[in-house]
A protein has these predicted regions:
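Histidine-centered beta-alpha loop that forms part of the nucleotide-sugar donor binding/catalytic region
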Residues: 24, 69, 111
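Conserved CoA-thioester-binding segment of acyl-CoA-metabolizing enzymes
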Residues: 1-61, 97
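Residues that form or flank phosphate/diphosphate-binding pockets in enzymes
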Residues: 31, 66, 117
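Generic recognition of short, well-ordered alpha-helical segments
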Residues: 34-35, 69, 120
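Glycine-rich beta-to-alpha active-site loop
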Residues: 95-121
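Glycine- (often His-adjacent) and acidic-residue-rich active-site loop
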Residues: 60-98, 114
Length: 121
């Protein structure tokens, strides 16, 4: 099994080529923030180009799959200038597109609540 190190997600691939992509902010119910969005995009790009990966399972650590957007992240974006709001929105769109366009089957293993962006994934 191989794994890659991130702060807000974990990525592990077993010997069968099954990659487990786990949202790892359980104290925040895996709510999306800028860092989680960036790391999901990076992981999607890595998994897409890894020929040893045959399928990706997306799940969340803890009681919730994903509570949607982190309110502190929303609050910070609301107070930011227009260019920052556009940049943050674009990062979210690119991450969702990277997951949607993954050239391997993507299976959602949803445990517990999924709201907002968590439903979108």
């Amino acid at each position: 099994m191989t794994s890659r190190t991130f702060q807000t997600i974990t990525v592990e691939t077993d010997t069968r080529g099954v990659a487990r992509l786990t949202l790892n902010r359980p104290a925040k119910h895996n709510a999306l923030n800028g860092q989680l969005i960036d790391e999901l995009k990076q992981a999607a790009d890595l998994l897409a180009s890894d020929d040893s990966v045959r399928v990706v399972v997306l799940t969340g650590e803890g009681k919730s799959f994903c509570a949607g957007g982190d309110f502190n992240w929303f609050k910070g974006n609301a107070a930011a200038d227009r260019a920052t709001r556009i940049r943050e929105s674009s990062k979210l769109a690119h991450m969702l597109n990277a997951l949607n366009a993954l050239p391997k089957p993507l299976i959602g293993r949803i445990q517990g609540p999924a709201y907002g962006g968590g439903v979108g994934m």
